């Protein structure tokens, strides 16, 4: 803050802008997750600062934003055909969120949509494995009877072994799930189909989610 002042850089707080400019447009936490609400408020506040819209236009923005669907964020799909292997994912949830709030929101989403017990495919960047994620990852892993740890082709990606060690030290394996390790996202998808009727959750990294969507040929323009 002090540095911004010295450099004459404008510093604007989203909470102040949104509460003032969108006082009549509030989102219910029972419908939208905390990370989504924060993104929503930041986007609308930035637009208002830039364009200084009137009340009618702000209401139009607000209405339009509520219809936005982000592929790969709490993205629940049904009957996803893996055409290469002629196999079908009855229920597939993909989410690239990798911070504390996003992982907690993912656990809440799994619970509210009755997706537990599930098979969890988890891959994360090594620089994300810090103490603030221990409890969120523990809550997430509790939903899974089978946890498949994998990695992507990126220097930032944690190895399956490093991820397993972090989860063990976080108490995430206390419920004794089955654990499988692989460096191949494609192999992880194959492993996840060992119980065809069990919901599959792929999470922890946008790289991982991108690979899953690419391998399965998922169209990012729509969800089913």
Locate predicted features.
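Active-site catalytic pocket residues across diverse enzymes, especially alpha/beta-hydrolases
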Residues: 50-51, 110, 114, 167, ...
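A glycine-rich beta-strand to alpha-helix segment
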Residues: 188-217
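Short glycine-/acidic-enriched loop or helix-start segments at secondary-structure transitions
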Residues: 103-104, 131-132, 159-160, 211-214, ...
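Short alpha-helical
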Residues: 69, 100-101, 127-128, 155-158, ...
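C-terminal helical cap/extension that packs against the catalytic core
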Residues: 1-12, 16, 37, 87-92, ...
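Cofactor-binding loop segments of dinucleotide-utilizing enzymes, especially the Rossmann-like FAD-
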Residues: 122-126, 151-152, 204
């Amino acid at each position: 803050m002090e540095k911004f002042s010295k450099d004459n850089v404008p510093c604007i707080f989203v909470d102040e802008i949104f509460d003032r400019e969108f006082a009549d447009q509030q989102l219910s936490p029972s419908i939208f997750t905390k990370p989504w609400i924060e993104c929503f408020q930041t986007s609308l506040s930035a637009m208002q600062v830039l364009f200084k819209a009137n009340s009618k236009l702000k209401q139009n923005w607000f209405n339009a934003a509520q219809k936005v669907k982000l592929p790969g964020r709490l993205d629940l799909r049904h009957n996803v055909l893996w055409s290469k292997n002629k196999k079908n994912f009855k229920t597939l949830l993909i989410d690239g969120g990798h911070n504390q709030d996003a992982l907690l929101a993912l656990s809440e989403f799994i619970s509210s949509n009755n997706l537990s017990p599930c098979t969890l495919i988890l891959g994360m960047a090594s620089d994300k494995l810090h103490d603030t994620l221990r409890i969120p990852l523990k809550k997430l892993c509790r939903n899974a009877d089978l946890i498949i740890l994998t990695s992507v082709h990126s220097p930032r990606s944690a190895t399956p072994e490093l991820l397993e060690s972090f989860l063990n030290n976080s108490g995430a394996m206390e419920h004794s799930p089955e654990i499988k390790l692989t460096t191949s996202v494609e192999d992880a998808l194959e492993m996840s189909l060992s119980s065809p009727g069990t919901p599959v959750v792929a999470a922890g990294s946008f790289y991982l989610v991108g690979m899953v969507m690419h391998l399965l040929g998922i169209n990012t323009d729509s969800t089913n």
